[in-house]
Amino acid sequence: MVHGGAERVLAQMIDCFPQADVYSLVDFLDDRSCLRGRPVHTSFIQKLPFARSKYRSYLPLFPLAIEQFDLSGYDLILSSSYAVAKGVLNGPDQLHASYVHSPVRYAWDLQHQYLNEAGLARGAKSALARTLLHYIRNWDARSANGVDLLAANSRFVARRIRKTYRRDATVIYPPVDVDHLALRDTKDDFYLTASRLVPYKRIDLIVEAFSHMPSRRLVVIGDGPETGKIRALAGPNVTLLGYQPFDVLHDHLQRAKAFVFAAEEDFGISPVEAQACGTPVIAYGKGGVCESVRATGAAPTGLFYAKQTCDALIEAIDRFEAMPAGAFDPRACRANAERFSAARFRSAFSRFVLEGYAALQAELGESSGVSIVPATQAEPPASPLSAGSAPVERDAATSPHDASRNETLART
């Protein structure tokens, strides 16, 4: 929870392709360690008024902006896409492999939820927003045709990709920095949740549920636009710590008796981080968490509740409390989390790209000249920052260079 999942993926992609050129719609990251010292080429949106704080307001320009990057000099294009990065233009002799965190959620299956949360369910502004999202959907569906290989960050997202683009995707789980999270066998008597305080994370649901369980203590780490609402819901048994540095978060992840999760996420990094510390997870049983938490079998690492409601969560907490001591082995939680290590991501992603590129070269009747860093050896450089590096935001592209070949990586 030092960076978002997209920044972690970008860092590991650059570790696999350490000479990559990076392209991004905008470039406002304060923490630049994920760039590994690489400079960033940005779109015209970077120079528009208020782009730093209001870049999402330029959504209608995103498709146009991503198509302005001239990547014709590269043989290999990689994109890490939440929205439009997979829409970079490329030719028949280039390989474009896209790591898709999700199809554009606010334009597809979650459109109505996003409009309701934004207060755009009715009225003239609603009509304008729906027209824009219709345009984004059409562009998004067309742009997927320019991708040769699709990777998804979970089976849940792979199903969404299949529904949206009618394409199959290889599942490559995102990297979690389990090496910097330590196992702790003994637990204290409190529950933990940690997240940005935004509507879809449903921290309000968790806090409200604990307000009905005054004998059970909850600690909340994180801040965001819903801070005021959540503070109003919190009873005396709920402690709101706001944003905290990694050391404080790590300490609480280690000591909590369970990590509580209420969001429907594409994957969900924080439940894996909790398990890496030996802490079981109590989660809403929908989305990527169903793949990262084991609720059945000989070595469970958590339990699920079926409905995104206070009553369902309270019932799940009651079930957890009624379980015998030792029902969740901290070492089993840790072992499960290690399935999502950065090293395993690098291995799977490098193999995915290398095999795809070799197949294209065979089709073209050429031998591959691309030099790809083996994932098992792809370690971050000693100094992640260098002069001239630039920050990245939500949409970017990168390309590594070889003496005889060029590669490109695009990120959204």
What is the predicted role of each segment?
Residues C16-K86:
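Active-site donor-binding segments of glycosyltransferases and PAPS-dependent sulfotransferases
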Residues P280-G285, C290-V293:
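Short hydrophobic beta-strand element within catalytic cores of glycosyltransferases
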Residues A182-K201, L205-V219:
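Conserved donor-binding/catalytic core segment of Leloir-type glycosyltransferases
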